[in-house]
Each structure stands twice: as structure tokens, then as C-alpha cells.
């Protein structure tokens, strides 16, 4: 069997690595992939851009691909799933209409309101003056979001009124995020603990993945600007069995039923970014129509089920007939980033110290890497993700940092506290 995975990040490396464990899979093509996927057994990079829909369809036809898994959001929002389905090619992901859950923050907030799904109070604006009047009336802290896709960076958590006003002017006048900023959503600042709750959906049935928690801020103790994510761990102890049930009943099921009732049944990975308050009430911060990055890396380390079989079951609308199995151990992934990220950063720096031999329960997933004249070099802001399993989050953290310590390039940095909330909980016990 041949599989195609669309994307080039750490998430796609992890999905490809996991999919390769299926004994019936002979080749997994990754378009376009990275230096790490190129080295992986059974994986083969294909130089097709993630947004080249016609090229991807033609390739999948030519190679008789039996399953395509979409990693990033951009191809979903421009309709890759619709194009594959029209060509009769099996693909796991939401249609262009369903992908609005991630593609438009305003669509999502209005959808949540229509279906009484808990989220923060909000308003949408396209003009500066009314937006400024609204934040002055609401006060800070307050959250300002660019409406469209901004690679996870179009969200400003403004702790002062001045920051909120600057963000609004940037997004609407300066258009800091290209087209994405031509409308802003301003919403209430939610206090609590964040969790990433990712499920597989087949249009009707839902199969939860392991819980996880991402670390969005670039600096230790959650300081500095937001990024695409600096590290993650799984499971997230904030999601107790009781809170897990509440999330399914109050957020996930109403979302899946709501999308179906509006004529956009949802198939694919659905990621709810949640804030869980001190009473255990989950509120939706955002939806993503795909697996999170870097959450995928620790989650795939823990997955004992067969990813390919689960995706095929979802395409056949049979998710109610399968279950997911997980390693009871904790897993943690630490992102190694290029100096300057999430602003301007260097590319082309040679990476040294990558492990030559893989040890059970440890894996370095590649993201922004490239092969140049036999060297593996940096090619993005988030370059690698050092991931490890452990009997506790503390043990997984220790192993992951030991792994990260072996690797270096000019300007490399990482956070030093990934998993700190879960470790504090472990120490309380």
C-alpha cells in the first residue's frame, strides 16, 4: 500500500514515522518533506508544494495512492480534500467549507455562538475606530486575533490597553498579517490552563486522541511573543477523566453535530484549543483542522494503534468500530529553534550532533531542515523536536533534554521548562 502525507514539518515527520509502522505500507511519499523524512525507512520525499493542489492530485493518481493524510492547514483551506475526492482519491481531512473552522476566526466564533458551545465573549471588526472603542470599553487584558491564517502567530494577548490598540492598528491599517488581518476578532481574555484536545472525526463518529499541552510563548515561564509552539507533552493532567467527558459532551459532539446540521459534515483531525478554568469548565480558544505541531510528536510516540488503519476507518465512516490504544508512559517534545525565531532567523546553518543510532523511547523529529551537499542544515524557525517517553513527565523531560543537549548549530535555542505545569502537579503528589 502507498500513502501520501502532505507537509514538511515535525508533525509530518511524526505522522510518516508512525504510518510506516503499518506492515502493509510499502512506501510513504511526503510532499515536500524535510531532511529527516528523507532518511526515514519507507519514506520518500516528493518535491511538490503543499499548495500545488493540481500537482498533488496528479501525483496521487500516477502512484495509485490509497491514503493521503494532510498535515498543515493551508492546503485544507484552499480545498485539497475537495479536489482529491472529485478525483476519487481517498484522503483524510476536512473539505474547504469545513476547514473554515480554522480558516476564519470570525466564522468559528459565530458558529460557537449558534451552537451554544462555551467560548469567550467577542466581537468582529473590519474598521479601526469601532474596534478601538470596543477595547476601551472592555479594558485589558484582552485578546486581538487576525481573522485568517497567520501560521499560529496572528494572536496578540494584550495585557495593556496600549498593546491592544497597537495590535488593532497593525492588523487593520498596517495589515501586519497580509490578507489575514483585514478583519479582527477581539475577545475576552480567558484565565486558566490550556489543553490541546485532538480527535479524529468521520463526519459523525469521534475517536479521541491522547490529550496534550502545548507551550506557545517563545520564552521560559511563558514570556515573549507567541510562536507556532515551543514544545508539548502528553497526556495533559489538567484533563481529568471528568473534564475529558465534559469536553466531549460540551464541545466536541456539539461541534461535529453542528457542522453536519449546517451541511458541512466534518471529516479529519479536529483540534480544539481549550482553556480550562479552575471549576473545570472548558472554553474553546480556537479550532485547528489538523493535528497540532509540536503536539503530534509526543502523541505519536505514545500511539500504540495503527495510524493508517484509523485513517482508513475514518474515511469509511467506521470510527465507531475501532479504538485507539496508548502507551501509559508520558511523552515530551522540545522544539529546537533558530536564533531570532519567531521573528527573522538564519537559514543554512549546519546542524551537528544528530543521533546516529535511535534509542527506544527517544526520537528527533525534523521540521525546518534541509539536505545541502551531504550536510543537514537549518531551513526554518522551528528546526527539530527532541522527543522522549518516560514513566513520569519529569523522566520524559529529563530524557528529552539529554537528547537535545547532543545537538547544536549556530544560534540554536530552546525553552528550558517544557512540561513545567505537569511536573509541578507530579511534585504535589
Swiss-Prot record:
Positions with a binding annotation for Mg(2+): 286, 288
Homology family: Belongs to the GARS family.
Originating organism: Vibrio parahaemolyticus serotype O3:K6 (strain RIMD 2210633)
The protein's enzyme class: ligase
InterPro entries assigned: ATP-grasp, ATP_grasp_subdomain_1, PreATP-grasp_dom_sf, PRibGlycinamid_synth_ATP-grasp, PRibGlycinamide_synth, PRibGlycinamide_synth_C-dom, PRibGlycinamide_synth_C_sf, PRibGlycinamide_synth_CS
Enzyme Commission code(s) on record: 6.3.4.13
Catalytic activity: 5-phospho-beta-D-ribosylamine + glycine + ATP = N(1)-(5-phospho-beta-D-ribosyl)glycinamide + ADP + phosphate + H(+)
Record flagged with keyword Manganese: yes
The protein's name: Phosphoribosylamine--glycine ligase
Cofactors named for this entry: Mg(2+); Mn(2+)
GO molecular function terms noted in the UniProt entry: ATP binding; metal ion binding; phosphoribosylamine-glycine ligase activity
Residues covered by region (Disordered): 212-235
Domain ATP-grasp: residue ranges: 109-316
Composition skew (Basic and acidic residues), residue ranges: 213-223
Amino acid at each position: 500500500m502507498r500513502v501520501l502525507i502532505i507537509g514538511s514539518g515535525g508533525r509530518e515527520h511524526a505522522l510518516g514515522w508512525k504510518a510506516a509502522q503499518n506492515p502493509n505500507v510499502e512506501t510513504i511519499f511526503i510532499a515536500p518533506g524535510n531532511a529527516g523524512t528523507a532518511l526515514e525507512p519507507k519514506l520518500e520525499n516528493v518535491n511538490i508544494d503543499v499548495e500545488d493542489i493540481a500537482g498533488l492530485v496528479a501525483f496521487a493518481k500516477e502512484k495509485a495512492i490509497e491514503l493521503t493524510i494532510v498535515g498543515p492547514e493551508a492546503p485544507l483551506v484552499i480545498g485539497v480534500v475537495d479536489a482529491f475526492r472529485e478525483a476519487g482519491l481517498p484522503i483524510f481531512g476536512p473539505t474547504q467549507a469545513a476547514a473554515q473552522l480554522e480558516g476564519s476566526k470570525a466564522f468559528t466564533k459565530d458558529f460557537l455562538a449558534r451552537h451554544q458551545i462555551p467560548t469567550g465573549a467577542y466581537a468582529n471588526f473590519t474598521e479601526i475606530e469601532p474596534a478601538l472603542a470596543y477595547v476601551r470599553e472592555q479594558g485589558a487584558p484582552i485578546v486581538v486575533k487576525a481573522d485568517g491564517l497567520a501560521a499560529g502567530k496572528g494572536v496578540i494577548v494584550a495585557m495593556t490597553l496600549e498593546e491592544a490598540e497597537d495590535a488593532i492598528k497593525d492588523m487593520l491599517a498596517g495589515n501586519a498579517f497580509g490578507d489575514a488581518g483585514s478583519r479582527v476578532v477581539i475577545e475576552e481574555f480567558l484565565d486558566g490552563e490550556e489543553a490541546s484536545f485532538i480527535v479524529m472525526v468521520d463526519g459523525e463518529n469521534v475517536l479521541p486522541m491522547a490529550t496534550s499541552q502545548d507551550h506557545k510563548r517563545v520564552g521560559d515561564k511563558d514570556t515573549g511573543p507567541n510562536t507556532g509552539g515551543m514544545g508539548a507533552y502528553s497526556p495533559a493532567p489538567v484533563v481529568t477523566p471528568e473534564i475529558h467527558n465534559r469536553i466531549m459532551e460540551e464541545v466536541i459532539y456539539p461541534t461535529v453535530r453542528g457542522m453536519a446540521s449546517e451541511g458541512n459534515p466534518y471529516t479529519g483531525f479536529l483540534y480544539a484549543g481549550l482553556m480550562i478554568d479552575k471549576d473545570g469548565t472548558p472554553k474553546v480558544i480556537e479550532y485547528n483542522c489538523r493535528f497540532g505541531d509540536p503536539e503530534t510528536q509526543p502523541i505519536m510516540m505514545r500511539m500504540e494503534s495503527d495510524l493508517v488503519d484509523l485513517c482508513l476507518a475514518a474515511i469509511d465512516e467506521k470510527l465507531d468500530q475501532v479504538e485507539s490504544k496508548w502507551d501509559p508512559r508520558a511523552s515530551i517534545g522540545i522544539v529546537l529553534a533558530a536564533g531570532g525565531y519567531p521573528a527573522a532567523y538564519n537559514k543554512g546553518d549546519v546542524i551537528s550532533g544528530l543521533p546516529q543510532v535511535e534509542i527506544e523511547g527517544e526520537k528527533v523529529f525534523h521540521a525546518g531542515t534541509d539536505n545541502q551537499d551531504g550536510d543537514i542544515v537549518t531551513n526554518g524557525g522551528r528546526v527539530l523536536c527532541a522527543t522522549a517517553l518516560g514513566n513520569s513527565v519529569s523522566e520524559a523531560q529529563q530524557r528529552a533534554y539529554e537528547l537535545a543537549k547532543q545537538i547544536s548549530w549556530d544560534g540554536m535555542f530552546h525553552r528550558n521548562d517544557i512540561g513545567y505545569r505537569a511536573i509541578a502537579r507530579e511534585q504535589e503528589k
